Amino acid sequence: MTNIRKTHPLLKIVNHSLIDLPTPSNISTWWNFGSLLGLCLMIQILTGLFLAMHYTSDTATAFSSVTHICRDVNYGWLIRYLHANGASMFFICLYMHVGRGIYYGSYTYLETWNIGIILLFAVMATAFMGYVLPWGQMSFWGATVITNLLSAIPYIGTTLVEWIWGGFSVDKATLTRFFAFHFILPFIIAALVMIHLLFLHETGSNNPSGIPWDSDKIPFHPYYTIKDALGFLMLILMLMLLVLFSPDLLGDPDNYTPANPLNTPPHIKPEWYFLFAYAILRSIPNKLGGVLALVMSILILAIIPFLHMSKQRSMMFRPISQVLFWILVADLLTLTWIGGQPVEHPFITIGQVASILYFSIILILMPLVSLVENKILKW
């Protein structure tokens, strides 16, 4: 008798994507981050749902409702900190996942890669709007500064900003709509994840060598289900260590002060996972130029597949490209550090050098080095 998982219309889909899926036998731990992102999304949706049951999106009561969640709701503090630190884990996994894609040439799966970029933008938008909801000082001023960037768009900028605000400043209307968007976006993200997986399963997974090897595929279950389970365990362990021992480690103390439009904090900065982009934005003295650089710092990922000059897909056997890749990682860490520093000497110069280096590595150096490597290998 045929197994029900192979005949039932719904179970068949699960079977083809999680059980009998032919998977390369040599994929490393770097391939764990996809499933970890799925776990992060589930944690965020669940904790977010319970937070939304007690939160009020009104400027007068938003801050107190978050305080009430932490003090009066059963395990409210746990739900709140799981949600806040869960976002940090989400971005750690996201950046690792994208880094893996660049290192091993997974960007040659164009549809999967492009949906991934849309997902990255959607998650960033969701995180930004979520940061506004507690209505602390950094929430308010972060929302003011970032939405104000749109005023750099010629002709329609100012009108666009006021339209997003729902008034002439960040106020009740802004908070309410941000809450609405913050609630709906994760479900849109979940739908996009399905499309991301659909396109991935059209081609099958890439592997560290970058060489397609259909004769050496193994079933996803039990080999990779157990491997993913180990990843889940490690992620939950790290998240719990963060939540239970230092829940405010990655947050900003200013956000424990209720929003006050009359008092600007000395240093306005976003959460740590946006600091690299914020540093690139600040490194350009012109407002429109800065906004374009900010958008391009992420959108540049869409150009990467067209700059692939190497005859090999993966960087596994390309030592010069590997060095360049790790310089890029170090550069991004430098930008993250600079984004959290005040705008003064020497941080301004370091930020500008790091920003130029970031774009130079991706747009100029990586394609050139690939051509040199081809030459060395007499290809």
Swiss-Prot record:
Provide the alphabetized UniProt keywords: Electron transport, Heme, Iron, Membrane, Metal-binding, Mitochondrion, Mitochondrion inner membrane, Respiratory chain, Transmembrane, Transmembrane helix, Transport, Ubiquinone
NADP as a keyword of this entry, yes or no, is no
Needed co-factor(s): heme b
One Gene Ontology term of the biological-process aspect is: mitochondrial electron transport, ubiquinol to cytochrome c
Asked if the keyword Electron transport belongs to this entry, the reply reads: yes
| Residues annotated as binding heme b b566 | H97, H196
Residues the entry annotates as binding a ubiquinone: H201
What's the family? Belongs to the cytochrome b family.
Q: Further notes on this entry?
A: Heme 1 (or BL or b562) is low-potential and absorbs at about 562 nm, and heme 2 (or BH or b566) is high-potential and absorbs at about 566 nm.
Annotated PANTHER family: CYTOCHROME B
Protein's name in the database: Cytochrome b
User: Native species of this protein?
Assistant: Lepus sinensis
Task: Tell me the name of the encoding gene.
Answer: MT-CYB
